Curated annotation (Swiss-Prot):
Protein name: Histidine ammonia-lyase
Catalytic activity: L-histidine = trans-urocanate + NH4(+)
InterPro entries per record: Aromatic_Lyase, Fumarase/histidase_N, HutH, L-Aspartase-like, Phe/His_NH3-lyase_AS
Biochemical pathway: Amino-acid degradation; L-histidine degradation into L-glutamate; N-formimidoyl-L-glutamate from L-histidine: step 1/3
EC number of this enzyme: 4.3.1.3
The protein's enzyme class: lyase
Gene: hutH
């Protein structure tokens, strides 16, 4: 059980809820804050004080006063009119993350919603009823209005949901799950949609996958080092301590562990004095990606525990302030940074692929072909990797430098953070395929060298991946191999590190 209190949610907690399907519940203390904040909203409505979002219109209509009897209609109309998302739906895990993150944000007690609304979000989450939320349509300020409106639709029994593997009308899913729709009252519609939970949900899923992929790239790069008889001296601790970046030091340490008893690596001067940068500089390049991942994680964990609603209610309602916490600029920057960092893992991996298949750069069979000339072997795999890498370069263009004014120029600067997060997720997917291609080529190279000479760790890795992709004995449709191994990388852990006592205590 993950307990939500509005301030302590971590990426590890999110992973447990999203992928291990642990249930989530609100702490008693946070629910008390919610009730106090709600009482303040009800006083404002009763006393007919003019407060944005409670008894006024929205955006450009903020100066239009709404009568008390129209309060519920105001919130419903907001959700209906703002549900303008288009395109394919977010993956269910992202929809699931939105439910979790919105509940956690509301539990801070600054938004004035009823406890029943948070209970509805958690009921959807725990019973695995996932709103169908189109991916396109958010500007990233005022928060993720369109995506979160589709989330809100499901809570009130409208729109669509995924339930038990099927897409269906929301009311059908609610009945099957035993959930009653809620009716939104004062401020609740705005509190649901005025936030950054779509970009942050997409961002945290991207981060979780990127972190796993970063570890996987090191292990597969270790196989490549063996396949190319790489020089192990480049990973000597003294080199990396001399520079001082902890992440670089950690990558080098892990590579040394993976290759500690390898009979395929060489020493400087044995075959060559130096290796190419794509081998020699793995700690420097991969380490820089880890630096970025640390930055991204820090910003995500702040945002996951942030109040991003507007207005916010303080001091039991004595202080109600309109501000701009819904602006997604911090996450937009973080996601753009993540795109760049993961793209670099693909860039350097593609160069290692080239070194594995190019006969001018190694002493392996040309293109790792069992019968060069008659059979092309891995030749076009490098083309596929090059295409994916080039696509990443386009996707890595920063979304956060763009802005288009909206709402009659009232909302005249926006973050495009959700676009950045969506593109980051695609960059990760592309990079995973590049890494799968490197793995296929590295497996073949190590097999040619003699798997019996490989390190204990990489030998185990080799055996696991050979269950997914067989040896290349003749040309075949390699697309199937790439997709199978890509799927395996996404779903499986590569020899869980916690089972290796030698790695305990290392920064893994």
């Amino acid at each position: 059980m993950v307990t939500l209190d509005g301030s302590s949610l971590t990426t590890a907690d999110v992973a447990r809820v999203l992928f291990d399907f642990e249930e989530a519940a609100a702490s008693e203390e946070s629910m008390e804050r919610v009730k106090k904040s709600r009482a303040a909203v009800e006083r404002i409505v009763r006393d007919e004080k003019t407060i944005y979002g409670i008894n006024t219109g929205f955006g450009k209509f903020s100066d239009v006063l709404i009568q008390k009897e129209d309060s519920a209609a105001l919130q419903l109309n907001l959700i209906l009119s703002h549900a303008c998302g288009v395109g394919d739906p977010f993956p269910e895990c992202v929809s699931r993350a939105m439910l979790l993150l919105r509940a956690n944000a509301l539990l801070k007690g600054f938004s004035g919603v009823r406890a029943e609304l948070i209970e509805q979000l958690l009921a959807f989450l725990n019973k695995r009823v996932h709103p169908v939320i189109p991916q396109q349509g958010s500007l990233g300020a005022s928060g993720d209005l369109a995506p979160l409106s589709h989330l809100a639709l499901a809570l009130i029994g409208q729109g669509e949901v995924f339930f038990e593997g099927e897409r269906m009308p929301a009311m059908t899913g609610l009945k099957k799950a035993g959930i009653q729709p809620v009716t939104l009252t004062s401020k609740e519609g705005l509190a649901l949609i005025n936030g950054t939970q779509a970009m942050t949900a997409m961002g945290v899923v991207a981060y979780i996958e990127a972190e796993k992929l970063a570890y996987q790239t090191e292990r597969i790069a270790s196989l490549t080092i063996e396949g190319l008889q790489g020089i192990i001296d480049a990973f000597d601790e003294d080199i990396h301590l001399a520079r001082g970046y902890q992440e670089q030091i950690d990558v080098a340490e892990r590579i040394r562990f993976y290759l500690s008893d390898s009979g395929l690596t060489t020493s400087q001067g044995e075959l060559r004095v130096q290796d190419a940068y794509s081998l020699r500089c793995i700690p420097q390049v991969h380490g820089a990606t880890w630096q970025t991942l640390g930055y991204v994680k820090e910003k995500l964990e702040i945002e996951m525990n942030a109040a991003t609603d507007n207005p916010l209610i303080f001091n039991d309602g004595d202080k109600v302030i309109s501000g701009g916490n819904f602006h997604g600029q911090p996450i937009a920057f973080a996601m753009d940074f993540l795109k760049i960092a993961i793209s670099e893992l693909a860039n350097i991996a593609e160069r290692r692929i080239e070194r594995l298949v190019n006969p001018q750069l190694n002493d392996l069979p040309p293109f790792l072909s069992p019968h060069p000339g008659l059979q092309s072997g891995a030749m076009i795999m490098q083309y596929a990797a090059a295409s994916l890498v080039s696509e990443n370069k386009t996707l890595a263009h920063p979304a956060s430098v763009d802005s288009i004014p909206s709402s009659a120029n009232q909302e005249d600067h926006v973050s495009m953070g959700t676009i950045a997060a969506r593109h980051a997720y695609q960059v990760i997917a592309n990079t995973r395929r590049v890494i799968a291609i490197e793995a296929i080529c590295a497996l073949q190279a190590v097999e040619y060298r003699g798997i019996e000479h490989a390190a204990s760790y990489t030998k185990q890795l080799f055996q696991e991946m050979r269950k997914v992709v067989p040896s290349i004995q003749q040309d075949r449709v390699f697309s199937y191999d790439i997709e199978r191994l890509t799927d395996w990388l996404k779903k499986e852990s590569l020899i869980p590190d916690h089972q290796n006592k030698e790695l305990r205590g290392m920064n893994i």
